[in-house]
Amino acid sequence: MNHEEQKVEAMEQVEAQPVEPTDVDSEVTAEQARIAELEAQLDAAQQASLEERERAIRAVAEMENLRRRAAQDVEKAHKFALEKFAAELLPVLDNLERAIELADKENEALKPMIEGVELTLKSMQSSVGKFGLNPLDPLNQPFDPNAHQAMSMIENAELAPNTVIAVMQKGYELNGRVIRPAMVMVSKAPA
């Protein structure tokens, strides 16, 4: 038998064998199950990828917030580092102002000393002002409980109620933050 005859005989044998549909169906079913399994794995991997991406985005946002808060804390620390020192200087400023206020300006012998105290006060006010320490002088302004401390209330028909009519002690703020409220007398409507 030559090679051609063997091929023809093999083909006839293959054609003679009955093809059972269950074999094909089982192969298709197995392949479909494998495809479904792979699709499920792909979906799970995609879901895990999305979750990890969201987690990474949240971590980046959290780091940005942390960096921003740290920068704000450092800025506040620089801005208000002088708060205790400034609070200790307030009585000195008060005493210099009181000394000028109570000095006998008519006495010729005291005039050079009074001028010296005035210059010292101006110099000190200028120096502390450079660092953000500024006086609160609320005379004739509306009472603000955040910046003023009411020591008493006096009836006054000429001014609107809750207007500061006298300042007993100046208040001070450091870079916009009140470190000592002004002690004031406040008007109230006549009874």
Curated annotation (Swiss-Prot):
Example of a GO MF term: unfolded protein binding
Gene3D superfamilies documented for this protein: 3.90.20.20, Head domain of nucleotide exchange factor GrpE (2.30.22.10)
Subcellular location as annotated: Cytoplasm
Domain of life of the organism encoding this protein: Bacteria
An annotated GO cellular component: cytosol
Any matching Pfam family: GrpE
InterPro entries cross-referenced by the UniProt entry: GrpE (IPR000740), GrpE_coiled_coil (IPR013805), GrpE_head (IPR009012)
Predominant subcellular localization, coarse grouping: cytoplasm
Region (Disordered): 1-28
One annotated GO biological process: protein folding
Keywords per UniProt: Chaperone, Cytoplasm, Stress response
Amino acid composition bias (Basic and acidic residues), ranges on this chain: 1-10
Family membership: Belongs to the GrpE family.
Subunit text: Homodimer.
Biological role stated in the UniProt entry: Participates actively in the response to hyperosmotic and heat shock by preventing the aggregation of stress-denatured proteins, in association with DnaK and GrpE. It is the nucleotide exchange factor for DnaK and may function as a thermosensor. Unfolded proteins bind initially to DnaJ; upon interaction with the DnaJ-bound protein, DnaK hydrolyzes its bound ATP, resulting in the formation of a stable complex. GrpE releases ADP from DnaK; ATP binding to DnaK triggers the release of the substrate protein, thus completing the reaction cycle.
Protein known as: Protein GrpE
Organism, scientific name: Aeromonas hydrophila subsp. hydrophila (strain ATCC 7966 / DSM 30187 / BCRC 13018 / CCUG 14551 / JCM 1027 / KCTC 2358 / NCIMB 9240 / NCTC 8049)
